[in-house]
Amino acid sequence: SIGKTLINIIKQDKKNFEIVLLSADGNYKQLLKQAKFFKVKNLIITNQNSYKKVKENRFYKNMNIYNDFSSFRKIFKRKIDYTMSSISGIQGLKPTIEIIKYTKKIAIANKEAIICGWDLIEKRLNKHKTKFIPVDSEHFSIWYALQEIEKNLIEKIYLTASGGPFLGKSFQKLKKVNIKQVTNHPNWKMGKKISTDSATMINKVFEVIEAKKIFKISYNKLAIIIHPKSYVHAIIKFKNGLTKIIVHDTDMKIPIFNSLYSSKKFINSKKLDFKVLNNLDFRGANPKKFPLIKVLKMLPENTSLFETILVSINDKFVELFL
């Protein structure tokens, strides 16, 4: 959904963009439609069966079609301006690290890559002088709010969570739920994997870990707060008594658009009705209902091993569930 949203944004300003590369796993039909529309010459299709189907079709003989991300060195002859890395799961880490040296700016929407490989990503960003922008709505909001602000002024950062589809359900009722219920998020249109992570609240645990790594803030300065409407994306309390609250509509177009244009272009999107601010609802995150948030108290400050294991275990459980 991140990729489709970005494509739709670029369609509105097509004359100012040249897309050099598109990639997909199994959804090659959608990829080919996009490639045809934008006249994209380079495609990466990681699913072996999908790759063979396209490669053997003479209709696409004028395209450069690859099966893995080691082809970057063949595709890029100079640094491109912008890259979106939104490959789901830990498999997104390697291509994210590889692409950094070929791009001036990278927007990353892959939690697992940041959690498991931030040290490698950051080292690469510094080496190749590549600008980084987080695309998760919470991290983009924090990043935006902290521009030109010293980190030592921060007292606490609250990451908001909607509570997912089961906020009003008792823990007993959660013992018998199906895939459709789990993936039916009340506020966001997302893929099945991230919707499942949202329902269990492990998604928010991952976001706290991300924030710790990206903004170099200790876990004791980060907290989860339930905000069912999802209008507030981050709350930052400062030691000088002031608090910053970042509010925007529940539309991933907003962080994606601003990552692309660096907040220098006006967005054509649904404007937030400020009447909603009359009824903002905040609640504490209940560890009895969402026991996975207890994991945050177990995480050591200075190692990624536990976090990497957590990501791997969650990936496997979600795969088995779906």
Predicted region positions:
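Catalytic, metal-anchored helix/loop core of enzyme active sites in primary metabolism
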Residues: 1-322
